[in-house]
Amino acid sequence: MMRSSSLQKNIMLLRVGSKDSTRFRILILNFGPQHPASHGVLRLVIVIIGEVVTKLDPHIGFLHRGTERLVEEHSYMNAAVFMDRLDYTTVLTQTHAYCLAVEQALAKSRLCIRTQLLRTIFDELSRILNHLLSIATHALDIGTMAMLFWAFEDRERIMELYEYISGARMHTALYYPNQTLDHILTNELLAKILIFSRNSEKTYTEIYIALYNNRVWRLRLCGIGVVSTEISTSTTISGPVARSTGLQLDMRSGENYQYGYYASLTLRIFLGISGDSFDRFIIRLRELFESTRLIYNSLIELSAYINISVYNMCSYSNNPHLKIESLIELFRYSLGEYLLNISLVSGFVESGKGIFGIMLAANNTNRPYRLYIRSPAYMHLQLLPKLGAGHHIADLATLLGSIDVVFGEVDR
């Protein structure tokens, strides 16, 4: 990103008018950090000639909370809740990355197939939450309000599932390193997830019918914010932004890296052709259907590995998590009595925005020595100066909506 001083120097290179004219018609605008279309506290210093953007300088840091530093002051168990506060539109996938890093440092994990399946199910529910909000707010920025009401109906159903299993609608604190999820398994939970997976496709179809062939929607998105294949291979972009260029990059289907239960599921990766905003919209919309299919297949697999009557929370005599031994182990773990050997580990997941990663340095204590967060939205935000130059100022809202930026994980 350019600093404001270098931006002021480059302004002098822009001339408007006749060859003999020495006057400069340059207008510098501040877009944000309180603009409703900035998707958070983003400030853009824009240099325009007429309505065409010639220079773009993003400024971040207005939401900095020092998460990477705060984690160093808490035990491995207690630090997991900080991950929920980063990208608050897809909370569970980020906590999953942290759990993978800590479990790698433990060198052994007692997680059963049931827990891996449940993590996969709730990761896909978080992806649906993210894509629904991304498409709805993007359409709202363009001028379509109906998508917001349709999308939030399904988001409400998912948040009711979160509330059922954890008591919280957004920051669930559901995943913890090396901890199973058997205690949340009930007949009612699986029935709720199954009903949602069958009924949600109606909303996705309505969004497709309303937007795909909409002339205004296509005019505002097609050819806007084109990311070339060279940029996708030479930068650190990921997720729908990278896949819109034709780059097949998805951590769920990696040959050298697998997590959750994705290795046993059939995953379809959707790629774009032109790399513009419309391709990114189509990829997110198709991933909504794909996530629903993965949830349904995971429920089928889960039914083969579990006897619900044994792990039902209502059957107190059969629930192992209600025994005193499990309670003592949980207290010891939460108090930080578990030490991790000196190691440098990492955990990566495919979140709704792209590859989210946690790099962790352990030093034989009960808390991290150092933690680094790889935010996909931060990587995508660096594309704005290239994508915005040459477009009209009205297209900035389209660009921001198509790269899907949330500043909880950008500033962190």
Curated annotation (Swiss-Prot):
Top-tier EC class: translocase
Major localization class: other
Family stated for the protein in its record: Belongs to the complex I 49 kDa subunit family.
InterPro entries attached to this UniProt entry: NADH_Q_OxRdtase_suD, NDH1_su_D/H, NiFe-Hase_large
Keyword list, A-Z: Hydrogenosome, NAD, Oxidoreductase, Translocase, Ubiquinone
Function per UniProt: Transfer of electrons from NADH to the respiratory chain. The immediate electron acceptor for the enzyme is believed to be ubiquinone. Component of the iron-sulfur (IP) fragment of the enzyme.
Single annotated GO MF: NADH dehydrogenase (ubiquinone) activity
GO cellular component: hydrogenosome
Identification of the protein by name: NADH-ubiquinone oxidoreductase 49 kDa subunit
Entry's localization field: Hydrogenosome
EC number(s) per entry: 7.1.1.2
Transmembrane segments: none
Pfam families in the cross-refs: Complex1_49kDa
Catalytic reactions of this protein: a ubiquinone + NADH + 5 H(+)(in) = a ubiquinol + NAD(+) + 4 H(+)(out)
